[in-house]
């Protein structure tokens, strides 16, 4: 019996994204859809996405039906005739006769992927099926890009793609006003994810090279730093005045060489509420040089200066701090601590440094302490005794945004009433601090 598929029967076909073309096919899209669904059900496979489109050829070659579907796991078979659709279901039994040709009674598709002809980009396939506008689709489409390399082939195409993407990211971030450390970390993560979408093994093997690319070829001159707003642009509401007074008192103690370990200011509030700009403005106004550490506890030379007396930790998860055993370094400022950074010289964190933590609602340390207390743990006690909690809630604190609140007294009253979590956390007022 003659077979129309070129792949030998003993060759294992296995694919999660499958593209079929039924040439000169008179079946409807719904009939093909039913066939594909039943076939996958027999294989106990779930269809995540399915699209069927009709292409009308003007050269009298009839209609082509293009079928593309994505599965929850690989479709495996050694017999590709399984994709043949009977022209008339009653005539299926005639396949057993030796003199019967498959093409006379079955629509036999061209199948991809196949040796030497992989599906390189699922988006391209999807667009091809849609090109004539006569299609049906259902499910959730997933973009996947494949680049097949032989064992001895150098990944020049992958390198070219990742290098170009890196340059694109670098150019994009040059247009933004953003912190240099955050920029490097974000670009590295995006570059790694992009490489994984191309070829997971390639991404895994080249992760170190990607990191070197980012940290060696992005310089501070490439990135625009956020401008620091003048202190007068912030409203003189009670909670902000109290923060200013606390920092001013701590500055006086530093100036008088008073050996005192400061409690950490933990400031929680909604994202984009102006927390970062306020503290940068206050510290600049007080002439207190500061380190700004964002997203990751990075005490490397590029991100941390031991001579600066204030450390701002912005949007760093308390669980990450604990995992690195840095809780008593970041919060409460123990005696001088030595921090070991991987592949970096050891860094000294002075016990007399002023420590400020800026936290968004999704990484609330206040909520962490409450949950820790309910579970009968004791970690919350150290944080409670070595931190001043200030909650800015959802109200913006910059002058430019403040005008949208019509009732200024209501806003001021709100800021004077921080959350307390049933007495678990206490707030140190100005008198106790001094």
From Swiss-Prot:
Protein name: Geminivirus-like replication protein
Organism this protein belongs to: Onion yellows phytoplasma (strain OY-M)
Task of the protein: Introduces an endonucleolytic nick, thereby initiating the rolling circle replication (RCR).
Binding site residues for ATP: 269-276
CRESS-DNA virus Rep endonuclease domain: residues covered: 12-141
GO MF term list: ATP binding; DNA binding; endonuclease activity; metal ion binding; nucleotidyltransferase activity
Keyword Transferase: yes
Residues of the signal peptide: none
InterPro entries named in the record: CRESS_DNA_REP, P-loop_NTPase
